[in-house]
Regions:
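Polybasic low-complexity intrinsically disordered regions
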Residues: 1-86, 93, 132, 146
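Basic, amphipathic alpha-helical segments enriched in Lys/Arg and hydrophobic/aromatic residues
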Residues: 68-73, 77-81, 91-93, 97-146
Length: 146
């Protein structure tokens, strides 16, 4: 919240098909990279025999996440990264993968309660974000079973 105005950012971690795996919410004046560790730390990254089923194999992100300590942290967790480097790579090369998360964000903001933040309390907005994510997964499940 900035001067009493309800401004927030949605952080969405999705799979390769665009299904939202984890959603989070932060203030609008917080840098995007600060939310990544908390989102990934909730995945179980324990024993090697279970690691293939419980952690992302590769992470695609834009230039906002190009921070050396974040790259080292992901490398330490053995998560493959494809982060566009500041000043070197253009964002155009991420287009092959970026449309997946852009489509997911479009699905989520298609819900009226998420397109414009009507809720004053962040917890209420996060609840609607979780509900919209569950509905996206449910709709995808229906398409696969019909």
């Amino acid at each position: 919240m900035d001067r009493g105005k309800p401004g927030s950012k949605m952080h969405v971690l999705s799979d390769a098909n665009g299904l939202p795996l984890r959603v989070a919410l932060s203030a609008a004046n917080i840098h995007d990279s600060l939310a990544l560790k908390s989102m990934l730390s909730h995945f179980h990254m324990g024993h090697e025999s279970h690691a293939a089923d419980s952690k992302p194999a590769r992470l695609h992100a834009d230039k906002a996440y190009d921070i050396p300590h974040l790259r080292r942290w992901l490398w330490g967790k053995r998560i493959g990264i494809r982060i566009s480097r500041k000043g070197i790579d253009s964002s155009e090369r991420l287009g092959r993968r970026r449309w997946v998360i852009e489509r997911t964000m479009s699905w989520l903001t298609g819900y009226r309660r998420l397109n414009h933040r009507y809720e004053r309390k962040p917890g209420n907005y996060l609840a609607f974000l979780g509900l919209a994510s569950a509905l996206c997964c449910y709709k995808r499940f229906l398409k696969l079973t019909m």
